[in-house]
Swiss-Prot record:
Domain of life: Bacteria
Enzyme class, UniProt record, top EC level: ligase
InterPro entries in alphabetical order: PurM-like_C_dom, PurM-like_C_sf, PurM-like_N, PurM-like_N_sf, PurM_cligase
Keyword set includes Cell membrane: no
Record Pfam families: AIRS (PF00586), AIRS_C (PF02769)
Assigned protein family: Belongs to the AIR synthase family.
Keywords noted in UniProt: ATP-binding, Cytoplasm, Ligase, Nucleotide-binding, Purine biosynthesis
Gene Ontology, cellular component aspect: cytosol
The keyword Acyltransferase is assigned to this record: no
Gene: purM
Molecular function terms from GO: ATP binding; phosphoribosylamine-glycine ligase activity; phosphoribosylformylglycinamidine cyclo-ligase activity
Principal location listed in the UniProt entry: cytoplasm
Reactions this protein catalyses: 2-formamido-N(1)-(5-O-phospho-beta-D-ribosyl)acetamidine + ATP = 5-amino-1-(5-phospho-beta-D-ribosyl)imidazole + ADP + phosphate + H(+)
Source taxonomy: Bacteria, Pseudomonadati, Pseudomonadota, Gammaproteobacteria, Enterobacterales
UniProt name for this protein: Phosphoribosylformylglycinamidine cyclo-ligase
Length: 347
């Protein structure tokens, strides 16, 4: 340099003061998620967490996820308050299907230019998701990276660790022909299929804020946060013998249900057992999407599927309904012939 100008990190696009302001803004909501096992608070180089003493042979279960291009829709509509709930839901729902109780959560927030209000709104949503699932928000990383993201665009990722008793891991190995499948209703598309959602909005020239479905805007339907099933599922596991649980995320019915089925087993789904929520019917019609593609891309109103002995199915529906879930018998497990599909959806 020839002009002897003294440059700062802020001149390069990184505002340390804004980052510190964000930490101060979120301390209160983060504290509300605290669990007794957590040692220390925000600000350490690492977060410390003891294992709950009730576990005899504790097995740690971990998962990481994002919210896909639902985030792009949220940014376009300038609605950042619930995307954090989505982030937590995508992680903790993946843990609980194996019988695990979520313990702690960490987030990663990356942006080109840190907007403290936006980031605080997102992290407040993360804290809300942690409260809903009973896990502690123990830390995170806020990365301001000029040149990597356009303007104040941002991305988020989450990481969660849970614990399950070794003898109580749910891995699908007990699934047998005759088991009944119980569905748990979804709150909407959750956090999957949004690249197709956005394509449909584009080709149909639809403004989601000016389109109404069943008394609320299409934008509200599409940004409805992913349902967190942790407390309902953990309660169910304590009371009934559960053979398998599938979280219907990317890949829909066709790819997620087989993940928990042993070889030689087939899930036979009764499509007449439920009605698609209006948002899915709208997406199918507006995008001229085939039935097969709908079930491969979206949850179509089913957030989770539980497999359990037939004699327990009615009780499961009763318990889940009492927990506030919409639950119903959606199908059965059958023996599959060699080479047969592992999921059959009968109209």
């Amino acid at each position: 340099m020839t002009n002897k100008t003294s440059l700062s990190y802020k001149d390069a696009g990184v505002d340390i003061d804004a980052g510190n302001d964000l930490v101060d803004r979120i301390k209160g909501v983060v504290k509300q998620t605290r669990r007794p096992e957590v040692m220390g608070g925000l600000g350490g180089f690492g977060a410390l967490c003891a294992l709950p003493q009730k576990y005899r042979e504790p097995i740690l279960v971990s998962g990481t996820d994002g919210v896909g291009t639902k985030l792009r829709l949220a940014m376009d509509l300038k609605r950042h308050d619930t995307i954090g709930i989505d982030l937590v839901a995508m992680c903790v729902n993946d843990l609980v299907v194996q019988g695990a109780e979520p313990l702690f959560f960490l987030d990663y927030f990356a942006t080109g230019k840190l907007d403290v209000d936006t980031a605080a709104s997102v992290i407040t949503g993360i804290a809300e998701g942690c409260k809903q699932s009973g896990c502690a928000l123990v830390g995170g990383e806020t990365a301001e990276m000029p040149g990597m993201y356009h303007g104040d665009d941002y991305d988020v990722a989450g990481f969660c660790v849970g614990v399950v008793e070794k003898s109580e891991i749910i891995d699908g190995s007990k699934v047998t022909p005759g088991d009944v499948l119980v569905a748990l209703g979804a709150s909407g598309p959750h956090s999957n299929g949004y690249s197709l959602v956005r394509k449909i909005l584009d080709v149909s020239n639809t403004n989601p804020e000016q389109t109404s479905l069943e008394g609320k805007s299409l934008a509200d339907h599409l940004l409805e946060p992913t349902k967190i099933y942790v407390k309902s599922i953990l309660s169910l596991i304590e009371q009934l013998d559960i053979h398998a649980i599938a979280h219907l995320t990317g890949g829909g019915f066709w790819e997620n249900i087989p993940r928990v089925l042993p070889q030689g087993m087939q899930a036979v789904i009764d499509e007449a057992s439920w009605q698609w929520p209006a948002v899915f019917s709208w997406l199918q019609q507006a995008g001229n999407v085939s039935r097969h593609e709908m079930y491969r891309t979206f949850n179509c109103g089913v957030g989770m599927v539980v497999a359990l002995p037939a004699e327990l199915a009615d009780k499961a529906v009763e318990l889940l309904t009492a927990s506030g879930e919409k639950a119903w018998k959606i199908g059965v497990i059958a023996a599959a012939t060699e080479g047969a599909e592992q999921v059959i959806i009968n109209p």
